[in-house]
């Protein structure tokens, strides 16, 4: 690690300790509604040296080439960057970067305002295994730890194994050791907002058991789970939709169930599996999954997502779009999970504008459409904070439900 990175980390920790906290300690995922937080966007002048990272498409970031389908509502950000896109009146469209603390602070302020309990910070093993990615994700994580304690929100590490090979276990375990030292994950008094579960700090591992020919497999997954257990962590596992039946998107290997039984929480991946029309035929999986988990003394976190779109990422082929219908699709899922007895909820995602699942504030007025880069505007009749409000209402209902059951 370079002196610059060490100094940046030290300053971030010192700032976090200096601002104080609301004294809110998160001892359990039960009773919480959280979202995934990508934090992977960059702008050329934000200091990260990554250009328009994750905003750009196959041919850079310009009209006709971008990976994002939604455009953020930028009216509340302190710092913004000019883009190559313009609006119909010729004004330059601008975007934020989470590499800036002010951007992350704004996001956590929204979480507090609308009642979202917190976020799982996505930490891509491939990204943090290279200097540029590690520098970026360490910076965003520093910001998030500071903002989480400032606003009394829960925060937790979620590792994404996508694109990894058979060395994934050693990379992940080395990284969590470093993160733990930097952010005092084992010391709840020093970092009260870091999410614990079943008496231990929680770490999420996403991408276990998928049947899409990944270079790592269940042997590597077992090494990760064993390594985290030995280090004293509670574990949430992100698995395919049909994990229980071992079919379709899931490896047909019963060892997956052995690994699941060693974990504390299970979260199956539902994004893109249904739309508003097909959800009623799909949703029976949730209570059936819950029953299996109860039988094996595992907590279950069902996933809800507000919609989906990756037209720009995959234009013109595979331009999938699952409409939001002004929130009715999202509300349908939230309602069913709460009525089915969910004790915790995971929302995909807070800031995912690449695949159109973001619940943070997005814009109705979007840049001028061009072939290959047509942005999806916010539905008419709702405010940019509509999905944050729906998530916050679900969090209130969840807490009331659990109180009634006690």
What are these regions (language model features)?
Residues 8-11, 266:
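Short amphipathic alpha-helical "recognition" segments used for binding
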Residues 12-20:
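Hydrophobic h-region of N-terminal signal peptides that target proteins for export
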């Amino acid at each position: 690690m370079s002196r610059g990175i060490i100094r940046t980390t030290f300053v971030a920790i010192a700032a976090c300790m200096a601002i104080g906290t609301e004294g809110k300690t998160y001892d359990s995922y039960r009773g919480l509604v959280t979202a995934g937080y990508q934090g992977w966007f960059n702008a050329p002048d934000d200091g990260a040296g990554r250009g328009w990272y994750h905003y750009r498409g196959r041919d850079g970031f310009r009209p006709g080439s971008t990976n994002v389908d939604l455009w953020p509502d930028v009216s509340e950000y302190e710092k913004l960057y000019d883009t190559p896109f313009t609006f119909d009146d010729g004004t330059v469209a601008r975007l934020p970067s989470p590499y800036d603390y002010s951007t992350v602070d704004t996001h956590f302020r929204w979480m507090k305002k609308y009642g979202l309990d917190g976020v799982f910070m996505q930490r891509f093993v491939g990204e943090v295994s290279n200097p540029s990615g590690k520098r970026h994700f360490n910076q965003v994580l520093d910001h998030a730890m500071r903002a989480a304690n400032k606003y009394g929100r829960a925060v937790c590490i979620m590792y994404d194994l996508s694109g990894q090979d058979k060395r994934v276990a050693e990379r992940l375990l080395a990284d969590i050791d470093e993160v733990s030292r930097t952010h005092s994950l084992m010391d709840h008094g020093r970092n009260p907002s870091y999410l614990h579960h079943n008496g231990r700090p929680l770490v999420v591992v996403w991408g276990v058991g998928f049947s899409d020919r990944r270079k790592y497999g269940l042997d590597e997954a077992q090494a990760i789970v064993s390594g985290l257990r030995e280090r004293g962590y509670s574990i949430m596992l992100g698995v395919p939709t049909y994990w229980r039946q071992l079919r379709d998107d899931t490896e047909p290997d019963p060892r997956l169930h052995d690994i699941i039984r060693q974990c504390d929480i299970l979260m199956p991946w539902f994004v893109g599996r249904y739309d508003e029309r097909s959800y009623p035929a799909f949703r029976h999986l949730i209570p059936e999954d819950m029953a299996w988990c109860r039988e094996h003394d595992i907590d279950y976190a069902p996933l809800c997502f507000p919609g989906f779109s990756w037209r720009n990422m995959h234009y013109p082929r595979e331009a999938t779009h699952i409409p939001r219908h002004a929130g009715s699709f999202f509300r349908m899922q939230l309602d069913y999970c709460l009525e089915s007895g969910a004790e915790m909820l995971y929302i995909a995602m807070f800031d995912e504008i690449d695949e159109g699942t973001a619940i943070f504030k997005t814009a109705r007025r979007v840049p001028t459409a061009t072939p290959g880069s047509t942005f999806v505007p916010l539905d008419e009749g709702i405010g940019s904070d509509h999905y944050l409000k729906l998530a916050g209402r679900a969090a209130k209902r969840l807490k009331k439900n659990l109180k009634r059951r006690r």
